[in-house]
Curated annotation (Swiss-Prot):
Entry's family note: Belongs to the EutL/PduB family.
Species whose genome carries this gene: Limosilactobacillus reuteri (strain DSM 20016) (Lactobacillus reuteri)
Keywords noted in UniProt: Bacterial microcompartment, Disulfide bond
Compartment(s): Bacterial microcompartment
Cytoplasm listed as a keyword: no
Chief location: other
Record-given protein name: Bacterial microcompartment shell protein PduB
Amino acid sequence: MNDFLNSTSTVPEFVGASEIGDTIGMVIPRVDQQLLDKLHVTKQYKTLGILSDRTGAGPQIMAMDEGIKATNMECIDVEWPRDTKGGGGHGCLIIIGGDDPADARQAIRVALDNLHRTFGDVYNAKAGHLELQFTARAAGAAHLGLGAVEGKAFGLICGCPSGIGVVMGDKALKTAGVEPLNFTSPSHGTSFSNEGCLTITGDSGAVRQAVMAGREVGLKLLSQFGEEPVNDFPSYIK
């Protein structure tokens, strides 16, 4: 885990934090019922895990998906603040629920430890960014946050400015026999970010191939602004 806050923090709810996306993980072992009643969660649990960040939504959701798979926690809320510190994308608020505080802490740790991987196919340039995600088996966080079908392969193909995402999605669907789940755009589902995002499902190999095809054309288009988009971590979609 890439911690930049003091690991000996006296705040008992603190689990860890990462410079990647300015992401912080916390656990409330027994949440106040009055607060729980006001939270926008799909199911009430006494123990809550929280993953919150300034930059990135898809990477944190996919990282949290691994935390869900590794524990008995359930994803009960995903929200998309318009953020990226003034960029074209999102931050994210993810809340998970369960009965065991130790399980919640483990899920948050797994998510924080996966950020370097799930940010591997985020490519940035001054003019915009691309994000690609893939999993052979989606779980509850990808389902609630991105509309994935639990237990099936899932891919996310996203471009900023949003028009690049439209072309990326078209290329992806023409490349492999996959099923489109949704297309979100600035006024339709992205919390007004300047992104076009296609989500897909289908055979694992086909989904991977489609995501890679979208990435290829997206990199070519974004580079037309005069700067090669770069990723800060090694690509994991190969």
